[in-house]
Swiss-Prot record:
Its cofactor is dipyrromethane. InterPro entries: HemC, Porphobilin_deaminase_cofac_BS, Porphobilin_deaminase_N, Porphobilinogen_deaminase_C, Porphobilinogen_deaminase_C_sf. It catalyses: 4 porphobilinogen + H2O = hydroxymethylbilane + 4 NH4(+). The lineage of its organism: Bacteria, Pseudomonadati, Pseudomonadota, Gammaproteobacteria, Enterobacterales. This is Porphobilinogen deaminase. NCBIfam families: hemC. It comes from Pectobacterium atrosepticum (strain SCRI 1043 / ATCC BAA-672) (Erwinia carotovora subsp. atroseptica). Monomer. Belongs to the HMBS family. CDD domains: PBP2_EcHMBS_like.
Length: 313
């Protein structure tokens, strides 16, 4: 293939296309003569919309088709929302670049209420994320939590049609789509701990493709990469997938990395939390150590019950 072309595999949703175009613009900023093509495709997670994500099961619902395009040489890189990226990669592929993180928080979206606290008893809140569900139920057991699938526009339409009193989405996704005005309030990490890698864009490529790796190098954001490394290291040790009730969020304070995490029962009845601080150079070790702490507190029993529920449904 020509040396001045790079092809980006991406999902077809508006948000995924925004992320791919963002990477396209970054590449063109550093390499004005580079021809960057988008290769949109549909993933299994995009097709199965009538089933809660947790029940669809399996890892990599939104990335497998993109990875196949890389392996078959139909694309050179794949752009992912980091919270959708599994902890394991096919042989020959890997995550080489993490772009600068956007706002990692969850957004409270409603047409009638300004905050979670304002919701009356029995209000219906939409989210398919087990992580969001367990934290909502622990905080507000009086609410009715219902699954909500589809792209951002579809979810907002369901809210506007009166199917829900409020929905929970990612702040970053709404901002990227120019829908920031729909955010009634952003939920702090204390209210809703984000997903692993939430708000960050990751780039996957063939590990033996030195040309592509060299082109991607300027797009890597060192601080974001360290934070996401800690969060993902914790997730790897917990053997967590994308559709599990795990929250993890790392912050940097100078050279110190502060990692918080939780594993919760989907019904909100049990919440195991922990935090660790250490040198940013030990990001991966901090993630593993925090996972060990959560496992010692009983996280494995919660996760096992979740996986059994997914396999039997």
């Amino acid at each position: 293939m020509l040396a001045n072309i790079i092809r980006i595999a991406t999902r077809q949703s508006p948000l995924a296309l925004w992320q791919a175009r963002y990477v396209q613009q970054c590449l063109n900023h550093f390499y004005p003569d580079l021809h960057v093509e988008l290769v949109p495709m549909v993933t299994r997670g995009d097709i199965i919309l009538d089933t809660p994500l947790a029940k669809v099961g399996g890892k990599g619902l939104f990335v497998k088709e993109l990875e196949l395009a890389l392996l078959e040489g139909r694309a050179d890189i794949a752009v992912h929302s980091m919270k959708d990226v599994p902890v394991e990669f096919p042989d020959g592929l890997g995550l080489t670049t993490i772009c600068e993180r956007d706002d990692p928080r969850d957004a409270f979206v409603s047409n009638r209420y300004d905050s979670l606290e304002q919701l009356p008893e029995g209000s219906c809140v939409g989210t398919s994320s087990l992580r969001r569900q367990c934290q909502l139920r622990a905080r507000r057991p009086d609410l009715v939590i219902r699954d909500l699938r589809g792209n951002v526009g579809t979810r907002l339409a369901k809210l506007d049609n009166g199917e829900y009193d409020a929905i929970i989405l990612a702040v970053a996704g709404l901002k990227r789509l120019g829908l920031e005005e729909r955010i009634r309030c952003a939920l702090s990490p204390e209210e809703s701990l984000p997903a692993v890698g939430q708000g960050a864009i990751g780039i996957e490529c063939r590990l033996d493709d030195d040309r592509i790796r060299q082109l991607l190098a300027p797009l890597n954001h060192t601080d974001t990469a360290a934070r996401v490394l800690a969060e993902r290291a914790m997730n790897v040790r917990l053997e967590g997938g994308c559709q599990v009730p795990i929250g993890s969020y790392a912050e940097l304070e100078g050279d110190t990395l502060w990692l918080r995490a939780l594993v919760g029962a989907p019904d909100g009845s049990q919440m195991i939390v922990g935090e660790r601080k250490g040198s940013v150079s030990d990001a991966e070790k901090i993630g593993v150590a925090l996972a060990e702490e959560l496992l010692a507190k009983g996280a494995s029993a919660i996760l096992q019950a979740v996986y059994q529920g997914q396999s039997s449904s």
